[in-house]
């Protein structure tokens, strides 16, 4: 689907190693352009590459951000010269206390709470902004369940662009405030995320200067999630984990982490050892988990009802590709209740000092379920993606945590509280 015939095409673009857009269904290729649907079969497009001269040494000598992987991304060769939020290279935490608690001997947490707006969405938005600039757009826009709204508003402010963000009006107050503070235009829509996404798709076809990061520049945007896979492999000493658990909203993150692992193996940057990919959903929005359990390839849309609003996408665009990925690698997709999500948030905070938003709670709670079912190997090297900060979803733990005691200004009362 074309957004505008006036925007740049591949004959004049510098998008690094990217050479074309390829249909994930029929394989048809088109030149690089602001397109997201195949003109032949209407399947989704993704970026195809010709990689040249990518080495570990070149990567390790690069910036301490996702731009160290610029030679593996659809971004201009001079990407670091333009203002951006420079996310990435977040910490990979060895989680022995949590691992002992849940029964995993070799557990790591990829902690993306340390990104500029405290979620992994800074990665995908940084790549989308770099591509959008090269494609000739001038406004950065998105429909969002919250984290993407924060990232788009911040990246646009940093770049000096206008932002237009559409959100469901039921979004957590913290995420609304964390978007509005950057300026730009923030519009709350009376509907759920899927309603907001449909509205954004209509606007993307009408507003030729607007880069809707997860609509008309989605093929480029989605590639930003590969940097999670690249970083995990590099931080493990240039090797792949044996198991990785990824939260599933649209499903793009999971499929792109898998793509990253495969690219690293093909390029000889890591030994292409086997790995299993697992997906995590909340029961109140679990269309992919349901399809996996039923053994079908059909992901039926649902109406979300969960505290994990950042995962509340009832009609996930990459749902079928998530199923393909987990089945190909020997993984699985499962789901957990909201109560289990809250328990997992508290467990992670108590054992490792990381306060995750609800998506992280979903990931950890699903990990426990996968261990109990025997689907996760307790002895294998395992990575969990913690994709956002709990400060964004304080309402999830409200009523579950608070002061141990309330006392007067008396040391005796403090001591009684300590003993109680």
Language model: regions and residue ranges:
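PLP-dependent amino-acid enzyme catalytic core
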Residues: 2-420
């Amino acid at each position: 689907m074309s957004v505008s015939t006036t925007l740049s095409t591949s004959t004049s673009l510098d998008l690094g190693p990217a050479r074309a857009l390829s249909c994930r269904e029929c394989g048809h290729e088109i030149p690089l352009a602001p397109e997201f649907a195949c003109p032949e079969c209407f399947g989704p497009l993704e970026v195809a590459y010709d990689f040249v001269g990518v080495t570990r040494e070149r990567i390790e000598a690069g910036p301490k951000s996702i731009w160290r992987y610029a030679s593996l991304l659809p971004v201009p060769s001079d990407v670091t010269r333009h203002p951006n939020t420079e996310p990435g290279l977040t910490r990979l935490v060895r989680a022995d206390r949590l691992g002992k608690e849940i029964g995993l001997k070799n557990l790591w947490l990829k902690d993306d709470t340390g990104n500029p707006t405290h979620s992994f969405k800074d990665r995908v938005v940084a790549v989308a902004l770099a591509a959008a600039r090269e494609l000739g757009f001038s406004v950065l826009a998105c429909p969002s369940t919250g984290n993407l709204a924060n990232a788009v508003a911040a990246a646009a402010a940093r770049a000096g662009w206008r932002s237009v963000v559409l959100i469901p009006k039921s979004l957590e107050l913290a995420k609304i405030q964390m978007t509005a503070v950057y300026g730009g235009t923030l519009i709350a829509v009376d509907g759920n995320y899927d309603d907001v996404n449909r509205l954004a798709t209509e606007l993307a076809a009408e507003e030729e200067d607007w880069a809707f990061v997860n609509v008309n520049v989605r093929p480029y945007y989605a590639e930003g999630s590969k940097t999670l896979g690249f970083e995990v492999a590099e931080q493990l000493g240039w090797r792949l984990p044996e198991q990785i658990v990824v939260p599933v909203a649209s499903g793009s993150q999971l499929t792109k982490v898998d793509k990253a692992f495969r690219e690293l193996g093909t390029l000889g940057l890591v030994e292409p050892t086997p790995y299993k990919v697992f997906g995590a959903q909340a029961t109140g929005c679990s269309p992919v988990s349901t399809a996996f359990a039923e053994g079908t390839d059909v992901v039926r849309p649902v109406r979300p009802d969960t505290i994990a609003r950042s995962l509340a996408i009832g009609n996930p665009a990459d749902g079928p590709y998530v199923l393909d990925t987990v089945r190909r690698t020997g993984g699985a997709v499962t789901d957990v209740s909201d109560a289990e999500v809250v328990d997992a948030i508290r467990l992670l905070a108590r054992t490792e000092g990381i306060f995750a938003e609800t998506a992280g709670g979903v990931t950890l709670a699903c990990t426990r379920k996968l261990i109990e079912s025997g689907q996760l190997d307790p002895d294998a090297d395992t990575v969990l993606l913690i994709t956002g900060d709990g400060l964004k979803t304080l309402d999830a733990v409200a009523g579950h945590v608070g002061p141990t005691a309330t006392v007067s200004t008396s040391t005796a009362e403090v001591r009684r509280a300590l003993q109680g």
